[in-house]
Amino acid sequence: MLKQKIKTIFEALLYIMLTYWLIDSFFAFNKYDWMLESGGNICSIPSVSGEDRILQAMIAAFFLLTPLIILILRKLFMREMFEFWVYVFSLGICLVCGWWLFWGRFIFCY
């Protein structure tokens, strides 16, 4: 029983790390990243418009969070409440990470 719970937590952490890496590498691209000099910060380059960031965020959420939502619904249907709450918590963390990558890191630039 404890081994299964530890495995579930490990799977959730692995999914969070994979999602963060995929969003940062493939979905949160900025067409001005080539202007970033070594030692410079993100505020020194122009940023992509808000509409483009919303579109990128929605595409990333569709591809990366849909499997997690399906898993949450399955765990709820099967009445496996520990796994359900672990994956709901993972979904929340993935949403916060996505917010940070698309909008949060630009807060201090304005």
Swiss-Prot record:
Superkingdom in the source lineage: Bacteria
Xref: InterPro entries: DUF2645
Protein's membrane topology: Multi-pass membrane protein
All ranges on the Periplasmic side of the membrane: 30-53, 105-110
Name of one Pfam family that matches: DUF2645
Gene for this chain: ygiZ
Cytoplasmic side: 1-8, 75-83
Sorted UniProt keywords: Cell inner membrane, Cell membrane, Membrane, Transmembrane, Transmembrane helix
Transmembrane regions: 9-29, 54-74, 84-104
Subcellular location: Cell inner membrane
GO CC list: plasma membrane
Record protein name field: Inner membrane protein YgiZ
Organism: Escherichia coli (strain K12)
